[in-house]
């Protein structure tokens, strides 16, 4: 159950710490990021920023030059379903097209993230939540003052994955392209166990956040 009233951080820290949040699928990462946002943080979601770029005419133009006119609809918007068909296959050609897509979106997304972080710091916001897929592998560790890694016990995690329809083979393919979670935990500032209720997780997040803000 959600708590009746969200608790807020009323006093900004002297600086604006950047907290990277990572975790395997169904580990509670979005719940943590959303709760941190409710406590006064600026949530920067790289996936959402990247998706928003697909409405940019310059990006659509670059994608057309790579993948052809078929990805553009009659109203000049991008056909995301056609683009997905091109880049999310299992063959090497699809993988190559995905790398091309990432080569267009990732630099733009990084630039926007850097701009939003600078804005948050200039406005002396209490803290920033940096939510980036493959945050450690993508070179964002030095951007963060802290990295929080969500951890779920194996049995509970399997239940959560099954309940949300995750495909085991797809999960294994994803895992093969990134650091092991043991390595990620070692590279993180804090490992947060999500093995209780959602309310317990929120309380734990609040405690960890208080520790971060008090140290700044």
Swiss-Prot record:
Enzyme class: transferase
Keywords (A to Z) from UniProt: ATP-binding, Coenzyme A biosynthesis, Cytoplasm, Kinase, Nucleotide-binding, Transferase
E.C. number(s) listed in UniProt: 2.7.1.24
UniProt: ATP binding residues: 26-31
Main location group: cytoplasm
Pfam families in the record: CoaE
InterPro entries: Depp_CoAkinase, P-loop_NTPase
Residues of the DPCK domain: 18-216
GO cellular component annotations of the record: cytoplasm
Gene Ontology BP, a term: coenzyme A biosynthetic process
Molecular function per GO: ATP binding; dephospho-CoA kinase activity
Catalytic activity: 3'-dephospho-CoA + ATP = ADP + CoA + H(+)
Locations listed in the record: Cytoplasm
Pathway involvement of the protein, from the record: Cofactor biosynthesis; coenzyme A biosynthesis; CoA from (R)-pantothenate: step 5/5
NCBIfam families: dephospho-CoA kinase
Similarity section: Belongs to the CoaE family.
Function text: Catalyzes the phosphorylation of the 3'-hydroxyl group of dephosphocoenzyme A to form coenzyme A.
Protein name: Dephospho-CoA kinase
Organism: Rhodopirellula baltica (strain DSM 10527 / NCIMB 13988 / SH1)
